[in-house]
Amino acid sequence: MEPAVRGVAGVLVPVAFFAAGAAVGGRAGVAIASVWVAIAGLYCLANFWHCRETHCAVTGPGWTLAAVLGFAAALAPGTALSWYRVNVETMVFVVILAAGYGLEYVVAARTGRRAMGQAGQHAQDC
């Protein structure tokens, strides 16, 4: 899974999911976009638990909650969540991404480390 969320693939895969969701549109489109947001969120939750990367403290729960809201919008009857569509989910994804990496930048500037916690407390393979 990791190659799909890092590097060039980490840009192309979300773009593909969001583009597919936008092409389909409506409830199905937001469900498609929410699949990627859920994958990214759950990956970041696991990564934070394992490696303690600072941005994952924000992106993990943020994206997971955004995906839950996306699936709720796709499944909810009526128009209560009709405002939450692919364009909104994409903006939420980018804002959470910026907040996570912004926090990581601040932590790294202050501590010299991208990971939270004491030096050496995270896994060797991170």
Identify the residue ranges that each predicted region occupies.
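Cytoplasmic-side transmembrane-helix entry/capping segments in multi-pass membrane proteins
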Residues: 54-65
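Juxtamembrane "helix-exit" motif on the non-cytosolic side of transmembrane helices
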Residues: 20-24, 47, 72-80
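Membrane-helix boundary elements
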Residues: 1-29
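Alpha-helical transmembrane segments and their membrane-interface exit regions
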Residues: 36-46, 95-102
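Membrane-water interface at the C-terminal end of transmembrane alpha helices
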Residues: 74, 95-120
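C-terminal ends of transmembrane helices
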Residues: 42-53, 104-109
